[in-house]
Every structure is written in structure tokens, then in C-alpha cells.
Amino acid sequence: MGRIAYREADVDLMARMMRAEAEGEGKQGMLYVGNVIVNRVVADCGDFIDLRTVDDVIFHVQGGNYSFEAVQKGNMFYQRARETERKLARQTLESWRSHPAKYALWYFNPYAPCPPTWYDQLFRSIYGSLFL
């Protein structure tokens, strides 16, 4: 059994999100995004209470916005998943975890504007994204 229960539709959905959020960071960056998605399903705390599925996490709304910008903006998220990303998604759902995203629940682009509430938090930078 994987880290969480999932269906083939979850593999596809997660693969699309991993590509939309991190294609520019390569396979490793996409795996990190997948790690964050699975961690949110597992977390059951704070902002992620009652999120039990990949679908719940990806379409979660916080403060009036989707948690993942790609859902709101569309970009590559609404394109079909490619087999490369599907394999990465399956790998993450089954067992893959790595530092700095091993327990991460968020990530963001350090070069983009961010809300003031994000300042003074501990983070780790790798592959162009920051992990909290």
C-alpha cells in the first residue's frame, strides 16, 4: 500500500499539478511538489484538517483562493498528464519522500511577491522553490 489510498484518477490529477507547478524545476522539483500534496493528505492539522484525498488537497480553498495557483490560473494544469509525470506521481504516492520536502506542507517561489504573514518563517531552498 502507498503512503495514502489513491485511485488512477488521483495519479492523473496529481501528475497534472506536479507539472503545472514545477515543470521548470525538472523531475526532482515535481517530486517535491508531489511530496507536499501527499503530506497535506496525511497532515490532518491546521489548514489541512479534513483533507483526505488528492482531490481534496488540490481543490482546497483558503482565504477565498485555491491553495494551488495553477488551479486558479489554469496554465498547464488543465492539459492532459504525460506518462513521465504520471510515473513521478505514482512514485510519490507509493513511497518517495526526500529532504527538504519530506515533511513540507507548503512551497513558494522566493522571487514572487508573498503575503506579509509568510515572513519570519523557517524554510529550506532547493531547485528554485522554498519549502516550509
Regions found by a protein language model. Name each.
Residues 2-132:
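Bacterial extracytoplasmic/cell-wall-associated proteins, especially those involved in peptidoglycan
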